[in-house]
Amino acid sequence: MSEDFYDVLGVSRNADGDDIKQAYRKKAAKYHPDVSDDPNAEEKFKKIKKAKEVLTDGEKRQMYDQLGHDRFQQAEKRGGVGGGGNSSGGSARGDPFGGMGGQGSPFGDIFEQFFGGGQGQRRQGNRPRQGQNLQTRVQLDLEEVYTGVEKQFTVRRPEKCPDCNGRGHPSDADVRTCPQCNGQGQTTTVRETALGRVQQTQTCPRCDGSGEMYTQTCSTCNGDGVTRQEATLSVDIPAGIRDGQTLRMEREGAPGDNGGPRGDLLIDVSVRDHPDFERDGDDLYYRLAISFPQAVFGSTVEVPTVNGETTLDISAGTQSGEEFRIRNEGIPHLRGRGTGDLYVQVQIVTPENLSQKQREALEAFAEAGGESVDVSQGFFEKIKSSF
């Protein structure tokens, strides 16, 4: 038997929408593939997302509770599970036993959804509906990623029309019954499935579920009920976030219908390239130029970090391309579980112009090592030609 969605999120069957969302955020933060060390993190994260998708959709959750986990998944594979009209993720799920004349049958809604009939066919278009999610992008510097930042940004989003208050028509416009759904707000279709012939309803596309049509439309919003306006918002971005990750601001998306809540705003994070550092996960890489004497005799050098400087001991006899590790000078791990490291790759710089004294000293050095030195090709030229 597959794992129950309530068990996946670790909530009770009586949990409301806020409890489910809180549990989802906690589980997602723990098992997100980008931050979790669990070898099965990706599979667990998929289960967590699926559980949240079902349990925060009023109609899907009711069907899940009535059918049970295995039968629900079978029905979903056959195409017998539709998306709920209320995706707000809240606990309000309408009348849980509607359409059975007040009898309180636990199977009222599900049989009305599949087979139609009864009071379940009455207009549902006026129910509160959550607004659409919107998407935007913010750009960060590496220094902001290192510290975390409260980022202010501007987004254009739909807002309720100020002239018609979101109605889409003047308050004195004449109203008539929608001819397509006859005022029901829904249209009905019949199709064949693995369960047999089923009857399903959907929101009327002509009146958008209201069951009514108006003789005039608002000239400001052209009947849409919304206008696009700029909004200035700020979001707290945690230290350690990576390029391509997405943040969610709840209830900052498009306005809902019929008093429903706003959708969410999804913020895609983009991190600018840094002129000095390259990032790999939470580790940073830096190329450090040193002189030949520093490489030969060793030296203590200053190395830049994202938030300042630190010192590095170059050991005697260091070779070009050798790498040194400075612990805890990388990027903080997301969710505050330590810090990455800074890797410093040494590049020995060959001087292009030597004084006569420098040349003689290096030639003597080379000869002392048993090399035959051609004056026309000094020691550094040999080094150059070896690369």
UniProtKB/Swiss-Prot annotation:
The record's annotation in PROSITE patterns points to: DNAJ_2, ZF_CR
Name-wise, this protein is Chaperone protein DnaJ
Q: Which organism is it from?
A: Haloquadratum walsbyi (strain DSM 16790 / HBSQ001)
A molecular-function term among this protein's GO annotations: heat shock protein binding
Q: What's the gene? A: dnaJ
One GO BP annotation is:
chaperone cofactor-dependent protein refolding
Output the InterPro entries linked to this UniProt entry: DnaJ, DnaJ_C, DnaJ_domain, HSP40/DnaJ_pept-bd, HSP_DnaJ_Cys-rich_dom, HSP_DnaJ_Cys-rich_dom_sf, J_dom_sf
What's this chain's function? Participates actively in the response to hyperosmotic and heat shock by preventing the aggregation of stress-denatured proteins and by disaggregating proteins, also in an autonomous, DnaK-independent fashion. Unfolded proteins bind initially to DnaJ; upon interaction with the DnaJ-bound protein, DnaK hydrolyzes its bound ATP, resulting in the formation of a stable complex. GrpE releases ADP from DnaK; ATP binding to DnaK triggers the release of the substrate protein, thus completing the reaction cycle.
Composition bias, Gly residues? 80-105
**CXXCXGXG motif repeat residue intervals:** 161-168, 178-185, 204-211, 218-225
Classify the main location: cytoplasm
- Top-rank taxon, per record: Archaea
| Cofactor annotation | Zn(2+)
Q: What binding partners and quaternary form does the record give?
A: Homodimer.
